[in-house]
Amino acid sequence: FLVFLSLTSCTLNPTGIQLNPAWTSHSLSAWHNHHPDMMVVSQDKQWLYVSCETNASLLAPSLLAIHIETGKQHILLFGLHKADGLKVAPDGSLWLGEEFKDGLFWRITEPATLPSEQRVDRATLASSTPAIMPLHRVGNFKHEGLAFSKDGQFAYMADEWKEGCIYRYNLHTHQLKVLHKDKGWLLIRDAKHARMDAEKLHGQYFNRIEDMETLPNGQILLAETKTGRILKLDDRSTLPKVSTWLENNALIHPDNLAWDDKRHWLWITDDDDPSYLWAWDGHTLREIAHHDSAEITGVTLHGSDVYINLQQNLGQPDVLLRLREKAHVNDL
């Protein structure tokens, strides 16, 4: 039995979030046992989509849809196993990944036009609509990190485990390749067993890449949570190169990333105890918020507004928050 509560009129702070004095928070929604993780804003800027990291069940939510202007929301999809990675593709569709070793990416076309409560039968991979389909050629592995190239040619993905590789999928030729440290991109011949193929090809290992974000210059940032580093993938020349982009003693387990076009900041959630929300301006790592018990997840931007989830332990409601700088609040 699924419950979600609207908190659009909430002005108090019952959530336990500790905020930088220059910021305010506003609770938009609360859910029980939805495990909200990644968030994206639709291409037309009207919808906020939230992945739900639940176990596969026809009654377990996998994707929430929230209309940004009205606050109306619904469960768009049930049934995936540990839905996590989420991005808007160049064609406006949603790619929703499953975070387990045999996970798939699922493509959802025109999500704003779909009726609520669509379903996937995870045992048969059948869906309630042709608009939701598994992307078999993208590969089976633990999908969390995802980014698209600036020119719309490639999807970059990371296998989120201690010896996980980075993959590149050509959206036009449908070839899947793995990154080799010295040889560049090598062809994966069996997408269903991509991890095994990557090991045979000696793909470069990373220690749990949690999220990926495309910068305005086309470089791809990678949150390597176990090392505490933000890495940079530069794939703009013949031989791709990975280097450290940010390493800071205060940053322990970087998780979700979001580039802020207005402020030119990188937003970072930190899956430590307590959990933090950081903003990196190129010189200083600023603490914007922290929470002593909930995990801060899914940071994303809509204009100057910052959206985050509070993913709670069992028994406590998960919460969606909108953060605003007080200077911007006064301008409204």
Q: Which sequence ranges carry the predicted segments?
A:
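Sequence/structural signature of beta-propeller domains
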Residues: L12-L332
